Amino acid sequence: MRTMVSDMESAPIPGCGIAVMAKASTPGCTKTRLVPPLTLDEAAQCNTAFLRDVADNILAASAQAPIAGYMAFGPPASKPFFQETLPREIGLIDAWYPNFGDCLLSSIVQLLERGHGSAVVLNSDSPTLPTSLLVETADMLARPGERVVLGPAHDGGYYLLGVKSARRRLFEDIAWSTEHVARQTLDRAAELELPVHILPRWYDVDDLRALKMLQAELFEDQSFALDLRPNRPQHTRVLMQALIENSDLQDRLTFNAFRRAAE
């Protein structure tokens, strides 16, 4: 398995490395499950806003815990997009494989090889994820002993997985992109006899229902979880506000919600 870590070579190594699994914003290739109600161009714009907000969220968490942020990206030719889009404090990791499990494992291996005591892979489409959950993850992984930290998503997947050593088995026999991912990952951890710390459930913005939840959090002050303070994603908020004001997005959201309900 190839490994390559780029940028930040002279930076100090905080205890916990967090790598966001990221794709460059290409219309027709990025966030296509949001089309409709979004157009292909709007979906790509959302991807860019999400990436910027997730990066900012990691940087905010790094002020409260020893955390360093990265983007695990592919293909390699997309590197300039991330260099131009993200804060310079965010490192870049090449993690491009046909199998998503290999992408995750490679990212973890590279973080640990860089010298981090723990490694976390994080999704790129939860811009309102509470910063406190990233801090909690780093704190749990800083404790003695092996463990897994898992952040389950509302759709049966997970938004975050943290470990202290690379265990290939955690990524084997997983039905990726299904509602079984989190449960199967817990099964793999049980096979390895690894204790698991489970974070509160959160949501991925990858379909109409989740897009409506995001809108409610941004503009209606409705939190996905009442006992958690969501991150306030400025880039996403500005983009969504502009799309609502300058296009018929609000009508499209309503129309598609009614259409899905009738199906």
Model-derived regions: residue spans:
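Short phosphate-binding loop-to-helix
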Residues: 81-118
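Conserved donor-nucleotide/metal-binding helix-loop-beta segment in metal-dependent transferases, i.e.
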Residues: 129-155
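Short beta-strand-to-loop acidic/aromatic patch adjacent to the donor-nucleotide binding site
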Residues: 117-125
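Conserved alpha/beta core of the MobA/IspD/sugar-nucleotide pyrophosphorylase nucleotidyltransferase superfamily
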Residues: 184-263
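N-terminal nucleotide-binding beta1-loop-alpha1 segment
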Residues: 1-34
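Short, glycine-/small-residue-rich phosphate/pyrophosphate-handling segment
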Residues: 168-186
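Short beta-strand/loop segment that forms part of the nucleotide-sugar
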Residues: 67-75
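A short, N-terminal amphipathic alpha-helix
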Residues: 47-64
